[in-house]
């Protein structure tokens, strides 16, 4: 990711997420740990909405092996948040999901980060598994051209 703040136009899938009173910390803004919850929610919702992930029975699941978040501007309850999602890279067994967090109707990201998932067999949760065709197809829709 570049060091510049991304804009909404850089993302392909969007999920509105309300902030909650409990998200604020003693400093009056959303605590950093909450951003990772938003990242996870955006990725999971995309996978469910795309028809790839059925949580109780999916034979292939993604495990987070890397995360990062860069913060540019504060967010606080009762702000409205929109998570933007795009596929940064799809390898043989892994995907880099890139997420932008947008405050209210602002065009510049308040935070940006990524998750890297390695896809594994659900039963062993150890054996890396090639990305299924259905996942590759879904990722094509959120991969910038």
At which residue positions do the language-model features occur?
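Hydrophobic residues in beta-strands and at strand termini
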Residues: 17-21, 71, 119
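Catalytic strand-loop segment that frames the active site of acyl-thioester-processing enzymes
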Residues: 1-49
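Generic structural "secondary-structure junction" signal
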Residues: 23, 29-32, 65-66, 73, ...
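HotDog/MaoC-like acyl-thioester-processing domains
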Residues: 1-13, 75-77, 88-145
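Hydrophobic beta-strand-centered segment that forms part of the acyl-chain substrate-binding groove
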Residues: 46-95, 109-110
